[in-house]
Amino acid sequence: MSVITLTTDFGVKDHYSGSVKGALFNELGNVNIVDISHNVSPFNIIEAAYIIENAYKNFPEGSIHILGVDSEKNPEQNHLAVKLDGHYFICADNGIMSLLSNKINPEKIIEINIHNDVISTFSVVDVFVKIAAHIYRGGSIDLVGKQKDNLKELYNINPILNEKTKEIIGNVIYVDNYENVVTNISKKLFQEFGKSQSFEINARNYKFKEIVKSYSQAIRFDVVKENRKEIGKKIALFNKNNYLELSIYKSNPLISGGASSLFGLDYRDIITIKFK
């Protein structure tokens, strides 16, 4: 049985995400719905792409992913049903799929046209739910529109390599719920460019000279527990998705702040790694 996932910028205050689930239950009965996130920053396509890219691979092939971010149809933006990496994605052609498909080519891109006469301010319920239900029942996406060969392009920022100064100049691409700062510097790039040289990571006025393998590596287990002072320690590591992440060990953003607020870092801010 397929899984239907939801990734939106609806938040949890309003009725929007509940309405989508209600419409899916109304169409399909006892369907398995998973919320990936409803807290994408409003209309932030790049943030939504980061979240869904790092989540969808954990679901079984054949899963259906509804992407409700900047989803309204207009003369410059149609709706899509895309099969990619064995999964189905239903979204607007707003560039989000180009960010997901920059590593894997889509198997099929369908421009949805069965709703051309429908004027809606809530496309996720009025259109996306119906397409998801069609796919869930075993219907072909070829029946919901016409095939197209390309996607609207949206380009993410990539790290700059300076061979002369031996630097990687990267950027913040995501800040999570713990205020951990995720950069666009991959572990592969770090290893290939750095070639095991010593390094220094610079994030505004903060410097890191070590990359740990896990959050708990910040703990001095050789010190008696009562004397440890690791809470609040700044750490750098490559996260599960192999991107360089800056963090503060066990910080609570609601009380003392996390890496983003304490380091003064936000989306697109520069992080550099200088090799010696």
Q: What annotation goes with each model-predicted range?
A:
Residues S2-T5, V31-V34, S63-I66, H79-A81, ...:
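Structural motif
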Residues T5-L6, F10, G22, G29, ...:
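Short acidic/glycine-rich loops and adjacent helix/strand connectors
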Residues M1-E76:
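N-terminal glycine-/serine-/threonine-rich phosphate-binding loop
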Residues V182-L265:
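A conserved acidic, glycine/proline-rich C-terminal tail/linker
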Residues I119-Q197:
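Anionic-ligand-binding alpha/beta catalytic cores of soluble enzymes and soluble regulatory domains
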Residues D85-Y88, A92-H115, V175, E200-Q217, ...:
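Conserved subregion of the PPM/PP2C metallophosphatase catalytic domain
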Residues E27-L28, F43-E47, P60-G62, I66-V69, ...:
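Active-site histidine-anchored catalytic micro-motif
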